[in-house]
From Swiss-Prot:
Residues at the active site: C104 (nucleophile), C200 (cysteine persulfide intermediate)
Entry protein name: tRNA-specific 2-thiouridylase MnmA
Organism of this sequence: Neisseria meningitidis serogroup C / serotype 2a (strain ATCC 700532 / DSM 15464 / FAM18)
Disulfide bonds: C104-C200
Record lineage: Bacteria, Pseudomonadati, Pseudomonadota, Betaproteobacteria, Neisseriales
Chain residues that bind ATP: G13, L14, S15, G16, G17, V18, D19, S20, M39, G128
Keyword Transferase: yes
Region (Interaction with tRNA): 150-152, 307-308
GO cellular component terms given for this protein: cytoplasm
């Protein structure tokens, strides 16, 4: 297990899922003083048919009961709306595609929850993330999880050194099938529960239906780069770069993909073929930089992920100023999307990254 220096009092973030359930059970088995916290980060739609928050809380309470630990339900909904959801709406309004899970980790799970846990006398917090942590010469390093299919270091890149020092990830050295097996051995009610998908506050409801409640929509044309109209979109915010499904463009030839958004004309620019040149980029500019180590990495050679679960892409890091950097890739990268995160790695070490603003292709047009 990846720990700080002999933590004894640990508070586990119990989400009602199998991963956090096994995390708590393992720590209790290993002799630590363990308590659970269920974080209620969304509350507007508690009676919505798609909302699973209540069931998740019931599952978390049931798990705590079986393990034999206390659990508190703590409401961070106000902080979530202020720090995460407002940003989510702002980015979609600007034509970008944000990743609220990244911000939720930095602002809620490893800030609000961490502050709460420390206030309760905890030495450390634990979560069910598939990531690892190693301490070398007093420095806490965030590493990829051993299960490459589940590695979640991408979503943790905004953690600061002080947050990493107080966090442990007991599942980092395990693979998902083993976690399921352990859940069954511990007789946990979440052993067969399916993994959650999508953004936590949206749940299983259709994304378009949810977003329309908060942002105005405006239909417009789908056009080719040459300006030919080939269809109609239902609102630019509902589409992301590289999207293929849901375009509704008929006719012969290769599938159509979203290549860019023209916010001035309210047009969605689409191209035919996965390998169309407009879908590939050789460089990007990112800002709002955040790093996991006390000193930011030097300019130079690293690998990068511009979306979750993609293969590491070799690149060159160049700083433009204190808050902005450029990444130049060895090979063109597909559908690099403003609003998403570019995360840097040195081998297995997650160094940090930033928010993608622009690429060498005009993908968000505001002229």
């Amino acid at each position: 297990m990846n720990t700080t220096a002999n933590p004894s009092n640990i508070i586990v973030g119990l989400s009602g899922g199998v991963d956090s359930s096994v995390t708590a059970a393992l720590l209790k088995q290993q002799g630590y003083q363990v308590r659970g916290v269920f974080m209620q980060n969304w509350e507007d739609d508690d009676n919505d048919e798609y909302c699973s928050i209540k069931q998740d809380s019931f599952d978390a309470i049931a798990v705590a009961d079986i393990i034999g630990i206390d659990i508190d339900i703590v409401n961070f909904a106000a902080q979530y709306k202020d720090k995460v959801f407002a940003y989510f709406l702002q980015e979609y309004s600007a034509g970008r595609t944000p990743n609220p899970d990244v911000l939720c980790n930095a602002e809620i799970k490893f800030k609000c929850f961490l502050d709460y846990a420390v206030g309760q006398g905890a030495d450390t917090i634990a979560t069910g993330h598939y990531a690892r942590k190693e301490v070398r010469n007093g420095v806490h390093y965030l590493l990829k999880g051993l299960d490459r299919n589940k590695d979640q270091s991408y979503f943790l890149y905004r953690l600061k050194p002080f947050q990493l020092e107080r966090a442990i990830f007991p599942l980092g050295g395990l693979e998902k099938p083993e976690v399921r097996r352990l859940a069954a051995e511990f007789n946990l009610p979440t052993a067969a529960k399916k993994d959650s998908t999508g953004i936590c506050f949206i749940g299983e409801r259709p994304f378009r239906e949810f977003l329309q409640k908060y942002l105005p929509t405006d239909n417009g044309k789908m056009v080719t780069p040459e300006g030919k109209t080939v269809g109609e979109h239902v609102g630019l915010m509902f589409y992301t770069l590289g999207q293929r499904k849901g375009l509704g463009i008929g006719g012969a030839g290769e599938p159509w993909f979203v290549a860019a958004k023209d916010l001035t004309k309210n047009e969605l620019i689409v191209v035919q073929g996965h390998d169309h040149p407009l879908l590939y980029t050789r460089s990007l500019v990112m800002n709002d930089l955040s790093f996991t180590l006390p000193e930011r990495p030097k300019a130079g050679r690293y690998t990068c992920k511009t979306r979750y679960r993609m293969a590491d892409a070799p690149c060159e890091l160049r700083y433009l100023d204190e808050e902005t950097a450029e990444l130049v890739f060895d090979e063109p990268q597909w559908a690099v999307t403003p609003g998403q995160s570019a995360v840097l790695y040195d081998g297995d070490i997650c160094l940090g990254g930033g928010i993608i603003q622009t690429t060498d292709k005009p993908v968000i047009i505001t002229r």
